[in-house]
């Protein structure tokens, strides 16, 4: 049981302070992006390299792409979390305002990694559960940060768009029909597996997570 001295708001504040100031947090994220970036040439040269779990007989013929989550993988929402603490509120209170502000900063190493991916001729698909109404503001946020995003094809695939729900897997299946997915990046197991596999017990989640390297 929790002691009388336990204060949830204090714990939330400590978590936000850690994410914003800890060198270890900064380095861990930047190092992850660096490691994946170093694998780009290997992934491109090996045309059988496939980070998606479903096989495609045409995999060797398909152009390369990556699938990456947005919030807490690319964009740092810790200022929003701090705002919740200051206002003694909780998610989703104020989330719409935060997204429309388009003022999130990038997590360490994210922009450099994405530019490297694009410069190597790899398409980037941003698969996010932000609602479709935030598409314009999310694109604006990306452009402020210098994050590459296509103006020719829709590579920002959002919840509520085309009937998509919380499950990201159908969006990835669509991408995999026309691209060889060489990397998947995210901060949540649901960024990698179907929704039904993300709603299971802790031990089973750990087993599935061992198949992936989560950011």
Predicted regions located by residue number:
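Non-catalytic pre-domain segments flanking phosphatase-related domains
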Residues: 1-68
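C-terminal cap/substrate-recognition subdomain and adjoining C-terminal extension
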Residues: 2-4, 34, 131-215
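Sec-exported extracytoplasmic/periplasmic mature domains
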Residues: 41, 45, 80, 115-123, ...
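A general structural motif
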Residues: 61-63, 121, 179-181
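A solvent-exposed, charged loop/short amphipathic helix patch at secondary-structure junctions
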Residues: 82-101
């Amino acid at each position: 049981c929790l002691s009388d001295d336990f204060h949830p708001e204090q714990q939330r504040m400590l978590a936000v302070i850690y994410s914003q100031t800890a060198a270890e947090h900064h380095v861990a994220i930047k190092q992850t992006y660096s490691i994946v970036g170093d694998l780009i040439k290997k992934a491109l040269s090996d045309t059988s390299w496939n980070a998606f779990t479903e096989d495609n007989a045409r995999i060797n013929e398909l152009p390369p792409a990556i699938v990456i989550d947005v919030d807490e993988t690319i964009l740092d929402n810790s200022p929003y979390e701090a705002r919740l603490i200051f206002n003694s509120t909780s998610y989703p209170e104020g989330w719409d305002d935060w997204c429309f502000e388009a003022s999130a900063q990038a997590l360490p190493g994210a922009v450099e990694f994405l530019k490297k991916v694009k410069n190597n001729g790899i398409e980037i698909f941003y698969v996010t559960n932000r609602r479709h109404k935030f598409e314009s503001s999310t694109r604006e946020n990306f452009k402020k940060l210098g994050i590459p995003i296509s103006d020719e094809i829709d590579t920002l695939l959002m919840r509520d768009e085309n009937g998509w729900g919380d499950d990201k897997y159908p969006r990835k299946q669509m991408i995999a029909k026309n691209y060889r997915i060489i990397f998947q990046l995210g901060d949540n197991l649901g960024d990698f597996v179907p929704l039904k596999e993300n709603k299971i017990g802790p031990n089973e989640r750990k087993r599935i997570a061992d198949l992936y390297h989560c950011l």
